[in-house]
């Protein structure tokens, strides 16, 4: 009898087979949330840029009412804009990282996660260049890009020339429109996400009644 059933299955076209449900666990990013800082500030300000929405997102992901059993790690990377001096910016980004660390302690989950990484990256010239390259309204954009690329080994000179370019027109624009995007901490929530993939089962013969979809 069993052999007859197997033979019947093998005789079905490929589209007639019931798909076998499978379960996989994938290490993946659940959410990436960005907290922005005002110029020279280190405290988390809910009124700064999109912080209100970011905090709501963190509440939904990390609060005690959330399903947090799959969350395995938190990665926090903090940055500053390049308008300050080198030593000042190093101190500033460390303080911002510490501020985020204190802010996250409101969530009980954070105290239970085994892997929490905090990293102070400092001046984010790579993102700065991307923002400059994509901003068609930036005065002297090509000259700004040339200065960024040419003076990679002399950051102090690069900053000095950016301030002086065209009597500071480009720099004043960047202070208003580019630098605020760089003053941030990026919080990446990592977890094991369970995925169950069930294809639709459409019976094509009487033997399909043997399966449970």
Annotate the PLM regions.
Residues 77, 188-190:
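Residue-level recognition of well-ordered beta-strand positions that form the cores
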Residues 192-204:
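Short, charged low-complexity linker/loop segments at the C-terminal edge of domains
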Residues 21-30, 37, 41-77, 105:
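Periplasmic peptidoglycan-binding/anchoring modules of Gram-negative envelope and division proteins
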Residues 81-187:
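Periplasmic OmpA-like peptidoglycan-binding domain that tethers envelope proteins to the cell wall
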Residues 43, 82, 124, 193-195:
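Short loop/turn segments at secondary-structure transitions that flank enzyme active sites
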Residues 30-32, 69-71, 113, 182-184:
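Extracytoplasmic
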Residues 1-22:
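Bacterial Sec-dependent N-terminal signal peptides
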Residues 206-213:
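Amphipathic alpha-helical repeat scaffolds of TPR domains
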């Amino acid at each position: 009898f069993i052999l007859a059933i197997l033979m019947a299955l093998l005789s079905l076209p490929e589209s007639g087979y019931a798909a076998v449900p499978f379960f996989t666990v994938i290490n993946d990013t659940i959410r990436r949330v960005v907290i922005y800082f005002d110029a020279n500030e280190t405290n988390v300000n809910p009124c700064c840029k999109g912080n209100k929405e970011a905090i709501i997102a963190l509440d939904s992901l990390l609060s005690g009412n959330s399903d947090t059993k799959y969350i395995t790690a938190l990665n926090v990377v903090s940055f500053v804009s390049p308008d300050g001096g080198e030593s000042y910016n190093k101190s500033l980004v460390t303080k911002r990282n510490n501020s985020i660390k204190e802010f996250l302690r409101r969530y009980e989950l954070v105290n239970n996660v085994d892997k929490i990484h905090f990293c102070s990256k400092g001046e984010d010239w790579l993102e700065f260049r991307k923002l400059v390259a994509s901003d068609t309204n930036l005065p002297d954009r090509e000259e700004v890009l040339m200065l960024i690329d040419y003076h990679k080994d002399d950051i102090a000179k690069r900053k000095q020339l950016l301030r002086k370019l065209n009597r500071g027109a480009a720099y004043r624009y960047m202070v208003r429109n580019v630098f605020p995007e760089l003053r941030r901490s990026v919080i990446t929530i990592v977890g094991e996400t369970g995925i169950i993939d069930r294809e639709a089962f459409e019976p094509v013969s009487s033997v399909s009644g043997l399966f449970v979809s």
